Amino acid sequence: MKTFVKIMTLVVLLSLIVGCAPAPAATEAPVAATQAPVAVATEAPVVPAAPVLSEAEQWAKDNGVGPYQPATDDWAAIEAAAIQEGKITIYANSGGIEDLADAWKAKYPDIEWEGADTDGIDTKMAAEQESGNVVGDVWFNSDGHILFGRFVPNQWLWSFVPRDVVIPELTAERPFAVARHSTDVIGYNNKFYPNGCPVTNIWQLTEPVYKGKFFMEDPMSDVSTMAKIATFVQNADEMAQAYQALYGKAWDTDELAKTDASGIVVENAGYLWLKKLAYNGVVVLDDGDMVDAAFAGLELPEGEEPGFGWTGYSTYEATLDGELNMSPCFGMEPVMGIFKTSFLAIANKAPHPNAAKLFIRFALTEEGFDPWNEIGSYPAAEGLPVFEGNLPLAELLPQVWEMDPVFDWNNVSKVRDFWAASLLVAP
């Protein structure tokens, strides 16, 4: 009996143990098949939006000028459109433009001509652009510093160079057609000095012996002349070398190189030369004819030192005709003159854009260059004749400095202030 009880007790305990054990975890049935990958739609390549053109750029594009000029010029279509426009207006800073009128009228009788030597071209054209009342079609002007410094950034002028004309000096940065180069020189009176220019170094013009004997157009009233004298500042290193060669010492040892009580700071040898000119009684006059008469006129007193003048090389032609006694100071160190550039451009929103194209092409032909084919002027376009009496360019260029329109624009105001202050405090 006791044995039976023990057995039953053991059975009950085992039942309790089994009942308290956790049930085995259920396992999930294996997935029968994997899902197919979802296809992702690919986008079409993004096409860049066309650049938004300014109003001026749109006009240039519509009229095929500037960077929108076609690869070829359809001159038959251009001439037909120009005849429909019926007129051309040119603003030029040279009297030679008036000598071109007859040739134009003979070639294009159906296109009315309006072109004259115009003062203040930059002021006039800027006012037209700002007002929106554009009258002038063509800029024919040598004030390159204003062209590149003011008009180009404002999109007031556009380039146009006929595709059949080659002007080697053009670049992407300077794309405007070049009508010609001309030369300003330091001249002397060849009657008073029949054996040649009495000075060989430009610094001699600032010495007391020539006090009040250097004549030039007034830079304060002539923007072109102010840009020209900025060229001496740009080439200060060569001015310093010329000073050293003449005086045997550095330019900054000069008494006038020091900052004086007026506070004028002389930054380089170019500025020093301008200051010394002012202190030596430079004579500024209203125009080039007055300059020529002052030192090379036929009526100057006998035996009196006539001095020197900053004048056009073309003035020498008047000497050959017996009207003046001027010769350039060839061989002067470091230079005897300045090499200038006359640019052609089409006004933004010009009322006669096709006539303007026609004129630029005409101006770059032998017939169009003829009024300026004279001593001191050199064509820029290939194939045009050079005046027979001109000094060959290979001989001229080492004796002159070419004006840099970008430098001039960036520095002309500073040079103007320096020049004005020097004149003001000069004894």
Please annotate each region the language model reported.
Residues 48-71, 399-427:
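Conserved C-terminal helix/tail region of periplasmic/extracytoplasmic solute-binding proteins
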Residues 145-150, 304-327:
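A ligand-binding cleft/hinge motif common to bilobed small-molecule-binding domains
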Residues 1-8:
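Bacterial N-terminal signal peptides that target proteins for export
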Residues 13, 19-61:
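Ser/Thr-rich, Proline-interspersed low-complexity disordered segments
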Residues 89-102, 114-126, 134-296:
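Extracytoplasmic ligand-binding site segments that recognize negatively charged/polar headgroups
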Residues 51-57, 72-83, 93-110, 318-319, ...:
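Short, polar/charged alpha-helical segment
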Residues 337-406:
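Mature extracytoplasmic/periplasmic domains
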Residues 167-170, 181-184, 273-277, 322-348:
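Periplasmic-binding protein-like
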